[in-house]
Amino acid sequence: MDEVEFIIRLLQDNWSNASTITAGKKDVKQANGNAWTYTPTPMFIDIRSLEPGKGKRVDLDEKAVVIVYEDSASVSHPTIDRAVRNEEYSFTLHLRVLHRRDYTELTYSRRLLQVLYQMARHILEKNGLRPKVYDSNNNLEASAELIQITGRSEANDRGKRLLGYKLSVSMKRFGRTI
């Protein structure tokens, strides 16, 4: 499992747990004023994927999208004999929501984007120290030592009615044997 898959699986595997935790937050409301009770699972996309519907053209009418791609990687060898290595990876998580023209409430997409951001942040912060991803048989598939969000920027396109955040995420693995 490579690092981008690791981030995607970490988010996917923990999304339903995070939605029950964030459901009912007082500061995030639905159009009718009630607390959010359901947060749809977005489509997670590895930018390198060649699968149909998960590449250049994605239908945002049905689901929000989280696009994950690796920006950089660095390796250092902290010992003289170079028997172990430390790895550091930088990723961008691009959260995207389309405001459809049939939405009667004009701030719905903005609030949905805020909920998606809060859930992604909650998952990454909760699993920030020694995150692990397991396979279907509950066997450890991959792990890291540290994941943290290092920044957030707006990525909106009013003409296309796309709202988004770009999250910068750092992942570190220490003492990996060669």
Enumerate the language-model features and the residues they cover.
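Oligomerization/assembly interface segments of phage tail-like spikes and tubes
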Residues: 83-103, 160-174
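Hydrophobic beta-strand residues in large extracellular and virion-surface proteins
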Residues: 7-11, 45, 66-68, 91-95, ...
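Acidic-leaning, charged glycine-interspersed low-complexity segments
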Residues: 113-172
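A short acidic/glycine-rich loop-to-helix N-cap element
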Residues: 104-110
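Small/polar-rich, solvent-exposed N-terminal microdomains that initiate assembly or binding
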Residues: 1-82, 130-137
